[in-house]
Amino acid sequence: LNAGADAVYVGMKSFSARKNAENFSDDELAAACMECHRRGVKLYVALNTLMYDDEIPAVEKCIKTAAECGADGLIIQDIGTAELSRRIAPQLERHASTQMTLNSVSGVKAAEEMGYSRVVIGRELSFEQIKRISENTSAELEIFVHGALCVCVSGQCYMSSIFGGRSGNRGLCA
């Protein structure tokens, strides 16, 4: 914030692709939202892992908590989570996580039709592919240019399971 960020991305204790990070408790999330908004900064909550049916009540709770704390939006991988967020907290922006593997014009347009206002496209794309997508969508686009150096396709990683016995698709990248 002190360096002038216009947005902050955070994870809660569950369903973040950075499961082993020191993610935010409900109280910490509320305080972070207040501080960000006091400074004119948006705060987005990452719910960017795959979900299973038995986790739906917990996902619903996370969505409600994010909305009640004042988050501006959610970064989502699972389309079921997107639908839940649309019903539970329609005021929240929905951003399609890079974990969704949206690497084509048709994929980005489908996300747009589902109500995503921003799409984080794959870091594997060439400049020409990025340009083609940007010329054919009204959704905001985001792309990682620094950070994780995945050797697989974003959102389709099984290397962590093979080498580390952990799932990168569930927030436990090895």
Which residues does each PLM region occupy?
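Active-site pocket-lining/capping segments in soluble small-molecule metabolic enzymes
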Residues: L1-L102, I121, Q129-A174
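As written
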Residues: G115-Y116
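Conserved nucleotide-cofactor-binding alpha/beta core module
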Residues: S104-S106
